[in-house]
Amino acid sequence: MIKPLKSSRTGLLAGVFDPVHIGHLFMAHLAMEAANLDRVWFVPTHIPPHKDSAKVPYFHRVNMLEMALKEEPKFVLMELEREARPTYSYETILSVKHVLGEKPYFILGSDEWEELHNWRRYDLLVKNAIFIVVPRKPITVARPEAEAIFTDMTPINVSSTYIRQRVAKGKPITYLVPKTVETYIHENHLYYP
């Protein structure tokens, strides 16, 4: 049996990370500042339930995350969704809450906040997590049933899709991803046509 961790303020940033980029890292920093977090757990999704499948295999995405997080000791890779099946956020949140012994802080963009009521087991999400919302666009929905902290700064506007498109066109991705991730992408011919 896993013992609950000593009380700490832990943020969760779940995603496909296909690939991880500076926008993800900056979003985690914004969340740390807004909620005075002790650490952020990056949780790569093996099979995303809400999107088409990832473009590269899970092990490549995990390797890139390990490289990207190496320089920041408060950013930790947690393979909580490594099973080869769709894993829903409420499952991850319940698992983490059990380990921590308290509600985790779930980091998401305002676009996801707007759609949160459509997520599987919304009732369990709002009951078992505190949300940190990073504005990607203006927030138009109030969710009084959910505990939430809103950051006051917009994250860097970059997406994994944009990075994949640039790689496929032979364009540089310098400054969009950590240098180690850029090297890994090219050495492994990821996202090439």
Curated annotation (Swiss-Prot):
Pfam family, one: CTP_transf_like
Catalytic function, reaction form: nicotinate beta-D-ribonucleotide + ATP + H(+) = deamido-NAD(+) + diphosphate
EC code: 2.7.7.18
GO biological process: NAD biosynthetic process
Family (UniProt): Belongs to the NadD family.
The entry's keywords: ATP-binding, NAD, Nucleotide-binding, Nucleotidyltransferase, Pyridine nucleotide biosynthesis, Transferase
Any one Gene Ontology molecular-function term assigned to this protein's record: nicotinate-nucleotide adenylyltransferase activity
Identification of the protein by name: Probable nicotinate-nucleotide adenylyltransferase
Keyword Zinc appears in the UniProt entry: no
